[in-house]
A protein has these predicted regions:
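Well-ordered alpha-helical scaffold segments within catalytic/enzyme domains
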Residues: 59-62, 142-150, 193-200, 248-252, ...
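Conserved, well-structured ligand/cofactor-binding cores
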Residues: 49-50, 127-140, 149-158, 183, ...
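Residue-level detector of well-ordered alpha-helical segments, enriched
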Residues: 47-51, 138, 156, 160, ...
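Well-ordered alpha-helical segments within folded domains of soluble proteins
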Residues: 136-144, 188-195, 242-247, 310-314, ...
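Short connector loops/turns at beta-strand edges and beta->alpha or beta->beta junctions
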Residues: 139-140, 166, 216-220, 288-292, ...
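Terminal-appendage/accessory-domain detector
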Residues: 2-132, 233-243, 250-517
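Glycine-rich, mobile lid/loop segments that gate access to catalytic sites or pores
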Residues: 147-243, 247, 261, 266
Length: 517
């Protein structure tokens, strides 16, 4: 459970100034973090475990339901063999080792497929680093694969996971990739290359090389998120970036020399997009070393399947249902729904193409669809006499199947919705919050206003005890039917205190309907 700020322990940090070789600084930092560790706070480790368990629930569910991208990538991985001298990686639900980079791609794709695992909007107000780049806790399979290869125990593996989250989280605070049409997973690829190379024993030169290769050769663009209907490439973006990050790390460890000092390279993406004097990168980078001085405390949980920038609107509906109990039972009486949101959310989940989704990937990034489906779920709950809250309204895979996407009731509700840009007052509150308001004009109840919602449940600044309860419930619902015993699975994948042997086989549990390899 994320602890309140008052219960966190202070911790030291390391600053990598803009006028230094930050790629080499990251390499030094990664080696020190793993091989000369300072104690990490209990709050940080507990939060990290929860994000990892949450990601496993998402991945298991996607595979059990036959989601296309992770199934294709898992099949590809299971057809591969580890390199000579390698222990290989383990795919979710299989026991036979596979090529490391392919196993990582398969597992990361499964984790990300539902778009329901942890998220961040790079923001550290206390340090004035508020670039607000997106990111997700997609890259834990990189840590698991590196741990299996290096023979790490559970506590050491947690440090590799934390290292990945820290590097990508801090990069998200200082460099907004989206402004340059670059996909947010690139920060995760940089973090994965550094952490993987360090965990496998790479020296500073090898780690710097791996980082340089990822930046010079493998930059993903947001083309995967444009167009009327989104494809498998959207959900698999992190997986494919993790795959090349691991390949870059292993290639560098084998002696390949990639570009050095990549953050100050005038033709690399950083200075190319943000021109600055020779000898400088566009940003300072400060990274946690111990205590609870880590970016993970600014990361958020999703309480179901939805693009996280819609969470403010979902919280607004929950609040309105509590305030006006009759609303949930009568969505037909809604004459108009007006939602005011901020940029960049307005351009991402409210563009005109999102009003008529036909694929799951488009529906879970469509604010109109998410709200319409929630209104229909609320009506079903109201028929039982209950007031719909987050528990009852949790969006799950069935809410995005073909039948529900094509439901005429969805289209009818979307036709009464208007999503507007809330303007500077809303924009200024992001990325600290998810500023949203919902106003409903109802035939029986008149004008209903949610007021401004900034920190919905699941947000790092929301009620953490309530969030924890719902995240646990989400895990149970996602893996129900996919494994024999959800509680046993939750216990199995917690890493603290686990042996080297436990870690090596952590994901080798049966999943109903999956090829055991």
């Amino acid at each position: 459970m994320p602890h309140p700020v008052s219960q966190r322990t202070p911790g030291s940090t390391r600053l990598l100034p803009a006028d230094t070789n930050q790629a080499r600084g990251l390499a030094d930092y990664a080696r020190d973090f793993l091989h000369h560790p300072q104690p990490v706070g209990a709050s940080t480790l507990g939060l990290l475990e929860r994000f990892h368990v949450d990601s496993v629930g998402c991945g298991v569910s996607a595979l059990a339901r036959g989601a296309n991208a992770p199934t294709v990538l898992r099949r590809e991985a299971l057809a591969s063999a580890p390199a000579v001298g390698s222990r290989g990686a383990i795919c979710f639900g299989a026991r036979r080792p596979v090529a490391i980079e392919k196993g990582v791609a398969a597992d990361a794709s499964a984790v990300r497929e539902w778009d329901s695992n942890g998220t961040n909007f790079g923001h550290d107000a206390a340090k004035g680093r508020t670039a607000g780049e997106f990111g997700h806790n997609d890259f834990y399979p990189v840590a698991l694969a590196a741990a299996r290869e290096a023979g790490l125990d559970g506590d050491q593996t947690l440090r590799v996971m934390l290292l990945i989250d820290e590097i990508r989280g801090r990069l998200a605070e200082v460099f907004p990739l989206r402004n340059y049409a670059i996909d947010h997973v690139h920060h995760g690829a940089v973090a994965s290359a550094a952490a993987c190379a360090a965990a496998l024993g790479g020296d500073v030169d090898a780690i710097e090389s791996a980082i340089g290769m990822v930046v010079a050769h493998y930059v993903p663009y947001r083309a995967i998120r444009a167009g009327h209907q989104l494809s498998d490439s959207k959900g698999a973006s992190a997986a494919l970036s993790a795959e090349v990050a691991v390949s870059a790390a292993r290639r560098s460890l084998a002696g390949f020399i990639g570009p050095k000092d990549i953050f100050r390279n005038p033709l690399a993406l950083y200075r190319r997009n943000v021109p600055c004097p020779d000898g400088q990168s566009p940003f300072d980078l400060e990274l946690g070393l111990g205590g609870d001085a880590f970016a993970i405390h600014f990361m958020h949980f999703k309480l179901g399947l939805y693009e996280h920038q819609s969470a403010g609107a979902l919280q607004a509906l929950v609040d309105l249902f509590a305030r006006c109990p009759g609303l949930a039972a009568d969505p037909d009486g809604i004459r108009r729904v007006e939602v005011a949101i901020y940029e960049p959310a307005f351009s991402i989940i409210a563009d005109p193409a999102k009003r008529t989704p036909t694929t799951r990937q488009s529906a879970d990034h469509s604010l109109p669809y998410i709200l319409a489906r929630t209104l229909l779920k609320a009506r079903a709950t109201a028929t039982t006499g209950a007031t719909p809250g987050w528990n009852e309204l949790m969006l799950l895979p069935d809410d995005y199947d073909a039948e529900r996407i094509a439901d005429p009731g969805i289209a009818a509700l979307i036709g009464r919705m208007a999503i507007i840009h809330g303007g500077p007052n809303y924009d200024a509150r992001y990325p600290d919050g998810i500023p949203t308001s919902v106003t409903i004009d109802h035939a029986a109840f008149g004008r209903l206003e949610s007021g401004l919602v900034c920190h919905p449940l699941g947000h790092a600044r929301s009620d953490q005890a309530a969030t924890e309860t719902l995240v646990d419930l989400k895990f149970d619902r996602l893996v129900a039917g996919a494994v024999e015993d959800p509680a046993a699975l939750e216990s199995r994948v917690r890493l603290a205190g686990k042996s080297v042997e436990d870690v090596a086989e952590l994901y080798a549990f049966p999943i109903h309907g999956c090829d055991p390899g």
